[in-house]
Structures are given as structure tokens and as C-alpha cells.
Amino acid sequence: MNLEKLFGSKTKVDILKYLLFRRQWVSMRALESELEWTFPAIKKQVESLESANIIEIDKNSTGRSITLKAEVSQLLKELLYFGLKSELINLFSTYEFMIEKYFFGKCFEINLDMDLIVIYKNLEKPQIDKIKESISEIFRWYFIEIVNVVFMSLDEWNKRYRLADRFVLDIMRTRQE
């Protein structure tokens, strides 16, 4: 999913991701330093988001604090997680002969201890490291710095499944809910 095309601006998408996944009650100057966009670009997009009733700007004597409106916050979060999920699926499809299956977890509001579980076949450590780095880059693009990813070989997965391992059974149970 191309969020820039949906929202019409990379700056606007970065502001929304920042407000959803990093912090709220932030000033335009703080956004400028964190997002590395120019102040005029941020000001223009903040005004656009405010006129669209997506954000609120609390103008007090100490400055301006920007927050997402509560009524749109959950919808935006679902949309951005859909975009995140789509990018991960695209990444995994490039390795379709090496990745047997994958499961989305905690950060996708699925009741698992991990955020992402990847079951692989025919992968060596350098390939695993490359995929892990790509996964981290995708999450960082959404301003999600900490992500819990488990890589497990297909042989280990099958062995743990046969032994009724709790971790594997929890994953299978959440898939059926």
C-alpha cells in the first residue's frame, strides 16, 4: 500500500506515523527536528491535517501541541498497520521459496508474545540476517523501533508442533480465532 499516494504527501504520512507510533503533544519545531523535513513543509501539512479534522493543535502560552483527534486515531492506526502488513507481505513474497509461512502477532493486535514469527526453509545465517534487517527497516519507517521477531526453521517448527510445544500451539490457536 502506498501511503504517500493515499494521503498525497510524504511529509503528511511521516507526521501521522510519528503521532501514532512515537508520541503526541509535540510542537511543529520538534516535528521538524525529528522528521528532517523543513519547517514550512511541516507547517503546511499540519494545517492541512487540522483543516481535515484529523489533528488538534492546542495553542497555549508556551507553544503549540499537536495531537491526533481521538475519533480518527484508531482508524488511522488500523490503516497504517494495514500498510505495514502489506509491506511485510511484499517482502516475504520476494523470498517465497525460502519462507514457508509467517504469522503476525502482538503489534498487529493478535494475542501472541511476539510481533512477527517467520518459518523458513533453505536459509543460511547471512540470508536470515538480511531479511531481519529488511524487516527492521520497514518497522523503522513506521517509527516502530522495537520489534520482537522470531525466526524458526521448518524442521524445528514441525518438531515443536509434534511435541505440542506451547509457543507453537499458541500460534496455531490464534490463527483459528
Model-derived regions, located:
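Conserved beta-strand/loop subsegment of P-loop NTPase cores
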Residues: 116
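Catalytic core of pol beta-like nucleotidyltransferases
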Residues: 1-100, 106-111, 120-177
